[in-house]
């Protein structure tokens, strides 16, 4: 347990202590869920330790995915931010990255699914280990992932990019590059935002 806490602390210290990177620095390819040619891009800036993000992920996202992502209407990207406890959120995103593009969202969804129990018990270790294992990151790979400088640098660039876009709260949603809402969205609000994004896209 002590080793695990030390790794999480090192993760947070590493993210906070490196010099800021330029906002235009590359953040790597997007981890897109859905068809790459879907007409509307939905970006959600979220934290794995944000209760509002967890509620959206567990209560609204499944219906959103079925109605918009699985039908080819939307391509979705979750972009990371860190909320307290920031070291746990950072560790979760690092583990999701280590799972690779195909299983990135498997880890993200696994953490959100266990978030309420994690808050209730205070046992972040078990939550992260279980979610990471679902994405194929276990054993020695778990600790190696959390201490990987390249992964920390990549996450830092994503966080810097979010700051550059003025994101201050989670969740925050963009539709085709337009900020729609800071806060949880209902399925009805998503319907309206999707229709507005399509209409704006069709304007000459």
Predicted regions and their residues:
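C-terminal cap of thioredoxin/glutaredoxin-like
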Residues: 5, 47, 130-204
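Sec-dependent signal peptide hydrophobic core
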Residues: 5-12
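C-terminal segment of classical bacterial N-terminal signal peptides
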Residues: 12-21
């Amino acid at each position: 347990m002590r080793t695990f806490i030390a790794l999480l602390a090192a993760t947070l210290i590493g993210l906070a202590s490196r010099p800021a990177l330029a906002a235009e620095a590359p953040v790597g390819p997007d981890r897109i869920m859905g068809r790459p040619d879907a007409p509307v891009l939905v970006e959600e800036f979220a934290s794995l330790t944000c209760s509002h993000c967890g509620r959206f992920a567990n209560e609204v996202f499944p219906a959103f995915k079925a109605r918009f992502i699985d039908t080819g209407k939307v391509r979705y990207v979750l972009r990371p931010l860190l909320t307290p406890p920031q070291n746990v959120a950072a560790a979760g995103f690092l583990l999701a990255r280590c799972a690779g593009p195909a299983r990135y969202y498997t880890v993200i969804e696994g953490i959100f699914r266990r978030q309420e129990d994690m808050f209730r018990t205070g046992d972040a270790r078990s939550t992260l280990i279980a979610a990471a294992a679902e994405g194929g990151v276990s054993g020695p790979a778990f600790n190696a992932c959390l201490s990987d400088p390249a992964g920390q640098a990549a996450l830092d660039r994503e966080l810097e990019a979010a700051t550059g876009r003025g994101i201050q709260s989670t969740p925050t949603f963009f539709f085709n590059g337009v900020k729609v809402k800071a806060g949880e969205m209902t399925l009805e609000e998503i319907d309206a935002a999707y229709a507005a994004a399509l209409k704006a896209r069709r304007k000459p």
